[in-house]
């Protein structure tokens, strides 16, 4: 690797094989500067087409493809997605709540109460009374079931 001193000294520069523009104009009978530039090798240009693109098929010119070389870091993209505001969706009108609460919730509460009561009372007598109470509550809930279904049907008809 060359040091900065060698790179800056005029003696370290190799002589170029091609003539400068002033020397070309001064030399009589020399080819035009453009003709001299076509054959020489230089740094690859970012705008220059690749050799595959230069050789076209017949008279039809090939389309050049463009590639995006820059991509956002993942954390920036994730931050952008997380900060996006959600789209405003049209909300349906809220349904009226049932007055008496959920039937399923009531049944579950009765079953849990009966089981808790049965576990607390280890004797047969209190357990029998708890089961009779559970049976009465279950019968009352089953009698309310058709009324709850009728209320649901009316709510659906109002929508």
From Swiss-Prot:
Location comes to: Cell membrane
Pfam families listed in its UniProt record: DUF4658
Q: Where exactly are the transmembrane stretches of this chain? A: 107-124
Q: How does it sit in the membrane?
A: Single-pass membrane protein
The GO cellular component terms are: plasma membrane
Region (Disordered): which ranges? 1-67
- Residue ranges under compositional bias (Basic and acidic residues)? 12-25, 50-63
User: What InterPro entries does the annotation carry?
Assistant: DUF4658
Q: What keywords are assigned to this protein?
A: Cell membrane, Membrane, Transmembrane, Transmembrane helix
Task: Spell out the protein name for this chain.
Answer: Nutritionally-regulated adipose and cardiac-enriched protein homolog
